[in-house]
Amino acid sequence: MAARRRRVNRVATISVHTSPLDQPGTGDAGGMNVYIVEVARRLADLGIEVEIFTRRTARDLPPAVELHPGVLVRHVTAGPYEELDRADLPGQLCSFLSGVLRTEAMYEPGRYDVIHSHYWLSGQVGWLAKERWGVPLVHTMHTMAKVKNLRLAEGDKPEPAIRVLGEEQVVDVADRLVANTVTEARELIELYHAPPERVTVVNPGVNLNIFRPAPKAAARRRLGLPADARVLLFVGRIQPLKAPDVMLRAAAIMIAERPELRSRLIVACVGGPSGNGLARPSLLADLAAELGIADVVRLEPPAPQPELADWYRAADLTVVPSHNESFGLVALESQACGTPVAAASVGGLRTAVRHGVSGVLVDGHDPRQWAASLAELLDDPDRLAALSAGAVRHAARFGWSATAARLAEVYTEALERVHRTVPVGANS
């Protein structure tokens, strides 16, 4: 008779530097926030409770907030509430860990079956909590310093040595490493020497209930966009890594080559400054003025998901020119709404976008090459329509429920591995 599999009842999810309650597209909030929220909700629907530990960023935040039945967000005091740069967070990890351990100590031993940490800072906390509680650590990198440093944008700062070391330590101690794509798995193995047997690929997903096709004309009316405009859309945090400047420069070239485009082209950017982009919050506005296209550029603040879905539907193309992406949720959201994507052929975007079927992948970051690719697509409505249909089919393969179900399997496998290797009484 086969042994009964151990059940995972509750997961401690650690997200030190960004709260799942924050609006994606501003500050440090981005795709990782979406990932944590969507996965937590669906794990809870599977009967696995999730408690998310994140740093308190305002004095008036309650100790805990129920995000969804079975999902609790716990605010941990560690350092000043506001104006703490991410570069200063390593100095607050001991305080954060202390808060996590104090929370666990309020309950009977064994409250958490698994720890899932997100980003290297959280991995450091997860490492020590794993040692204290005797439970497995599952870690998702989301981005990796060595990869980012290999593909730096012009003017961007390299990731510091402390992060590289911290990531190497987390890779060494994690029981399972979750990679978003096969590409990321290969980078973990080749750059960080992760044992292949501890690396599992689990694709992120998209909320197919929110991001779904709907009439373009109605979306444009709601957003105040002309019905006959040609709309290029960028969604994301405004920082060198995301390369929104490439889209603006490409648009300027398109207008210079075809002046009649100026009266119809709209270049929309939805998002706020983040990371190294905070040094110049007016970067895109200044660049648009410098390029002489301020009249066609529309800068919008980060939008909640229902409004964001309208932006995708209203666009002819979503442009994702990032220097690197571990996956690229923006690309997937756009495709789920039926809008093809022109994306840089880097990292996880090669998985998120199916070249020639749901969009196109562009090599390099030369604005002239991007201008040619964008113009070619805008000039071919039949091809755009075919890519739109392909985008919906492609995105339908990436529901969050499938992501959560696979993660639940990873948690169970990690739990069974720990119980096979830890001697009886070792944690008593």
Swiss-Prot record:
Its EC number is 2.4.1.250. UDP-N-acetyl-alpha-D-glucosamine binds at residues 23-24, 31, 237, 242, 325, 333. GO terms for biological process: mycothiol biosynthetic process. 1D-myo-inositol 3-phosphate binds at residues 17, 28-33, 86, 119, 143, 163. One of its GO terms (molecular function) is D-inositol-3-phosphate glycosyltransferase activity. It comes from the Bacteria. Mg(2+) binds at residues 312-313, 315, 339. Catalyzes the transfer of a N-acetyl-glucosamine moiety to 1D-myo-inositol 3-phosphate to produce 1D-myo-inositol 2-acetamido-2-deoxy-glucopyranoside 3-phosphate in the mycothiol biosynthesis pathway. Belongs to the glycosyltransferase group 1 family. MshA subfamily. This is D-inositol 3-phosphate glycosyltransferase. The lineage of its organism: Bacteria, Bacillati, Actinomycetota, Actinomycetes, Streptosporangiales.
